[in-house]
A protein has these predicted regions:
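General small-molecule cofactor/ligand-binding pocket signal
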Residues: 115, 181-183, 260
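Short Gly/charged-rich anion-binding patches and loops
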Residues: 22, 64, 120, 144, ...
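Active-site metal-coordination segments of metallo-dependent hydrolases
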Residues: 57-64, 161-165, 223-227
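Generic structural signal for isolated residues within well-ordered alpha-helices
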Residues: 25, 68, 148, 173-174, ...
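Non-catalytic C-terminal accessory region of glycerolipid acyltransferases
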Residues: 2-11, 33, 71, 82-86, ...
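Catalytic core of membrane glycerolipid acyltransferases/transacylases, capturing the structured
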Residues: 128-186, 208-218, 252
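Membrane-anchoring hydrophobic helices of lipid-metabolizing enzymes
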Residues: 2-136, 170-173, 179
Length: 311
């Protein structure tokens, strides 16, 4: 990752964000249950306020969330869809507040409350020495489990660069505490080098990055632009693909990580078939706890030729 210039980190326009970082530092020192309870309240408030005309930013996120849930869960009644959307807001806000603990209060040991299931699958995949692609989705507990996951295995992580220098500094610094390498999504050569070195690379494969680097594959029964890089990376060094999902249990104030056996016969040589398979495992993980998925992102932004826009 390119180093941030002090002039950009400490310019006057960055001062308000530094104030938010200071607030986040304080939040990270609250008891975990308090953080979750605050997240519940703020999540409910954000969902309620998003229905007001002046809350345009949240209104946009609510529109995207409502649309995604309506498309992906047509079997639910309108009232059930609304409840799921509200709960999604709650878990998204809780997830944003939870990050303050591993990133800004690393002395707090979250490992006893983080359970890793299926670690033997990751260890078996790594034993071959060809590197491992640890593929997951954008669940709201994706960053809070970093401390527990890094204690179980030595992992590199791929991330998406933030345009604001302070947020970029914070997310990279926070992740560098727990992962061997923090790689920008665009740095394809670094991914290949690390797989050649036998490294485990964790990344989420469920965002819409446009048609140029994607194929269309069904996701919840809807054609979605799905990155084909997973197939290429796996084929490059014969790297096995292991799926990862993560959830929180608010009743016990704990988190869980679930690792699957390596996908068999992957890649198949058919990018659409491979993308469909990845979408299927992500969808199955979402259905276990749909409220904990990040429905705020425009998963169906890129449409097949001739298809109507959904947002």
């Amino acid at each position: 990752m390119p180093k941030q210039r002090p002039s950009s980190l400490y310019a006057p326009r960055a001062w308000p964000v530094w104030c938010l970082v200071g607030l986040a530092w304080l939040i990270g020192r609250l008891p975990s249950r308090w953080i979750a309870n605050i997240g519940r309240l703020l999540g409910r408030a954000a969902y309620s306020l998003s229905g007001l005309d002046w809350a345009s930013r949240w209104a946009s996120r609510r529109h995207i969330t409502d649309t995604n849930i309506r498309l992906c869960f047509p079997e639910l009644s309108p009232a059930e869809q609304q409840t799921l959307a509200r709960d999604s807001f709650i878990h998204t806000v809780i997830g944003a507040l939870e990050i303050t603990q591993p990133w800004l209060n690393p002395g707090r040991d979250l490992r006893p409350r983080t359970r890793v299931h299926g670690l033997e699958h990751l260890q078996a995949a790594a034993a071959a020495g060809h590197g491992v692609l640890l593929v997951g989705g954008h669940f709201s507990a994706i960053d809070i489990v970093s401390q527990g996951m890094s204690a179980a295995a030595d992992i590199d992580v791929i991330y998406r660069r933030n345009r604001h220098p302070v947020w970029e500094w914070l997310q990279v610094r926070g992740r560098q505490r727990y992962f061997g390498g923090v790689i920008e999504r665009e740095d394809t050569r670094a991914n290949y080098r690390r797989l050649q070195a036998g490294r485990i690379i964790w990344y989420a494969a469920d965002h819409d990055y446009g048609a140029r680097h994607s194929v269309f594959a069904p996701f919840f029964g809807i054609e979605a632009a799905t990155i084909s890089a997973t197939s290429r990376l796996a084929a490059f060094n014969g790297s096995p693909v292991v799926f990862i999902s993560n959830y929180r249990d608010l009743s016990t104030n704990t988190w869980s990580i679930h690792l699957s056996p390596a996908l068999e016969n992957y890649p198949s040589g058919d990018d659409v078939a491979d993308a469909t398979r990845i979408n299927q495992v992500i969808e199955a993980a979402i259905r276990k706890h749909p409220e904990q998925y990040l429905w705020m992102h425009r998963r169906f932004k890129t449409r097949p030729p001739g298809a109507d826009k959904l947002y």
